[in-house]
Amino acid sequence: MDSITVKELAHALSAEAVGNLDISITGAAEPQDAQAGLLAVATSEPFVARLGEGKAKVALLANGVDWRSLNLEAAIFVDRPRYALAGLTLKLDNNWRQGKAFIHPSAVIDPTSQIASGARIGAFSYIGAGVVLGKNAWLGTHVTLGNGSFVGDDPTLLDGVKIGQNVIIGQRFVAQPGVVIGADGFSYVSKEVAALENVRGTLGDRGDALPQPYHRIHSLGAVQIGDDVELGANSCVDRGTIRDTIIGSGCKVDNLAQIGHNVIIGDNCLICAQVGIAGSSTLGDNVVLGGQTGVSDNLFVGSNVITGGATKVLANVPAGRVMLGYPAMKMETQLDIYKNLRRLPALVKEFARLKSENQKKD
């Protein structure tokens, strides 16, 4: 990347800078790896302690750190270090949305599509009939926009992203490689009542249903996605059966997540890696689902709910709950159960001892 001075970087971060503000910075590193010309990111005490192992002249520090005692020539101070990383990494990212506006000659673009100014469209991409693509779009290679889809301004669609027909996406959308939006939902039915339906209704009894083939229920709905949404690599969002699947504004979805048909997700939710949300479930606003959380179908998860990793949600969750475990329960309850389970071997031994003593007395 082109170099940036300490003064310029501090201004970009709305941060305070001290020392030699004319030092040039070409990148960032952890303190022990930082060489001259790199900014040492030392925003917590363990990292500050390792500054002496590297050769950094400039460091990003939390407010209040004595920078002069660290043999630095300059420092940038921030109130909330992790938040500062968002601005810092954006400023120093050499690969983000690089390249001038152009359309690669191998791209296939339907003449009825509307592509606004500033678009960069990579090799072997396909834009279907009636597509509307907003300003300053950045498309990698092998990106597909299905017929009738709409994508707002400033989208970033990395290599291999597939957007199905009639999908509607808001402003500043980011899709990491391999994202698929608008594939058919997982929806099948048998002619007669199947064993799995009996099990679902009775919680265990298969009944006398005979094996039989399954028939596809086609997905006639689409997908709607709000503004400032990001989807991680190889995540999938299925189209609705009749109505649309909906993801609210500000949601961030990690890699390898599955969002089923008819799901509704509110605003500003965090969906971590390997989460699965089954069909027709609804999430409120500001929900956080830890990695490998599973949400069963046709459930409601209220606003501000947080689930720990690998939680399995099998029933509705009221707003504001913090959940953990399989099945999901209040985190403090689950932790109490876990602690008591660890005590079981000792309790069994104690019970056996007491039983033996009583038998001897008899």
What residue ranges belong to the model's regions?
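Structural signal for interior beta-strand "rungs" in well-ordered beta-sheet cores
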Residues: 41, 102-194, 202-330
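Terminal amphipathic alpha-helical/low-complexity segments used for targeting or macromolecular assembly
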Residues: 1-106, 167, 172, 178-179, ...
